[in-house]
Amino acid sequence: AIDDTRFVPAKGRNRIGSMVEGRPDWVLSRQRAWGVPITLFVDRKTGQYLNDPLVNDRIVAAAKEAGVDAWSDARAQEYLGDSYNAADYERITDILDVWFDSGCTHAFVLESGRWPALVRHDGGTHSADLYLEGSDQHRGWFQSSLLESCGTRGQAPYKAVLTHGFTMDAKGFKMSKSLGNTISPIDLMRDYGADILRLWALSVDFTEDHRIGKEILAGVADQYRKLRNTFRYLLGALDGFNDEERITDVAAMPELERYMLSLLADLDAKLRQAVDDFDYNAYTRLLADFCNEDLSAFYFDIRKDVLYCDLGPAAPLGTDTRRAYRSVLDVLFHALVRYAAPVLVFTSEEVWGTRYPDAGSVHLLEWPDLDRLVFPREGGDPELASADSALGSRLRGNTQLVEKWAQIRSTRALVTERIEPLRREKTIRSSLEAEVWLPNEAGDVDYEEIFITSTVHQGDWDVKRTENHKCGRCWRHLPEVTADGALCNRCETVLDAQ
């Protein structure tokens, strides 16, 4: 049974295995005044236990009515009935080992009849998907449950066992009232909010002992603010977005949008795997890194010019690039709010309710089906979505595109690094004033847009202050701008309603 069980972390298998192998016989009785009584009568002359179904039925009925206190000398004759004399029998006053009590939970929980899906075709009951407790329970609940279930059911009561470490103070000491280092979760929630406490719990390696303190939570609070800012940006950038503006032909989208959808599909697959592996530390890290590095520091930064400046009288729905950007933002919103919901419970509800005040709770939504988010007009019953579709298969697998943009991002980082000295020296105030020379300029990439700079040329590495004039609308320094304050070609086109 141990070999058939999944253990998280894997070392739990050897731990419980060695304990079971070396344990002595289990004596189930305990001589205690309080507990679940062993309801047996013993013949005073022969020392034999009385095994009479009618007697047992009367004891069970009394226990259902009055609880375990019904097992008393005063009611002994009532249970024995007319067939036996109470004076001839000793009522056992021992109780069951409390670990036997806990080890029976699978029987009265899983086999309670409340979950029909757990019932097998042969009338038996499937094991629980997961038992979750502290690492000390390899000697306790996990082991007693295993022994009791194997002895009576012939199988482990669980498919997987997950053990967690314990929470220490900021210095790594065990919390104790005598040391005065205890921390109340209620106080933490009052000071930081429940979502920050949840984010901390899911960010640590819970399989080991972990620390908590004000400085640690301050770092988590900073991470939370970055995630919250991602949703704040999405809500603002999607204001007024509708189906008329939506673009569903991904092939017609700019390469940057296709790249971001591919990254999202890759994130989706990794998050699914993290959940399957109970690796919530990886889950929160992947989510935070995507929001901070791929979105805020890259995608949002590049496309803010398009968002603000590609809308005007001549383009009431926005340019095709702006429409593609907002279409991708909508997909990102629907995916990310679902990804964040198990972690940032209240924030996700707030975000969802802000955009869709009449749509019910975000926690009633299922895991996002990326293909159906991206291609909503292609119809079909969402309940019939294939497994491949659910994995966003149509958005993944473009290795060439991902590798190309990984190189572009690497070059972008180098350009940003070379611009910083000019900014510190106040030679330029913004990257928009920088003119860049690259040794290997690809012809199909709008480097000015990606780097958020003025003109980009092919040549030896160099960054200088541009002599181009500044567009009065988008603030980009471009060759076609005739004087500071005049308009660039793009802005003239967008504003020309004739």
Question: Model-flagged regions — what are they?
Answer:
Residues T39, E467-K470, D484-L487:
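Short metal-coordination and nucleic-acid-contact micro-motifs, chiefly zinc-binding Cys/His arrays
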Residues W475-L478, N489-E492:
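Cys/His-coordinated zinc-binding microdomains
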Residues R91, E480-A483, A497-Q498:
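Short, non-ligating residues that shape and space the ligands of small metal-coordination modules
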Residues A1-D239, M260-R303, L307, S327-A340, ...:
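Structured secondary-structure scaffolds
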Residues G47-V60, V415, R423-H469:
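A broadly conserved sequence feature marking short terminus-proximal activation segments
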Residues S386-N398:
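Short Gly/Ser/Thr- and charged-rich N-terminal loops/segments
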Residues L217-E244, P342-T354, E433-Q458:
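Structured, non-catalytic alpha/beta "coupling" segments that mediate domain-domain communication
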Residues V42, Y89, F241-R272, F300-E378, ...:
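Acidic, turn-prone loop/beta-hairpin segments
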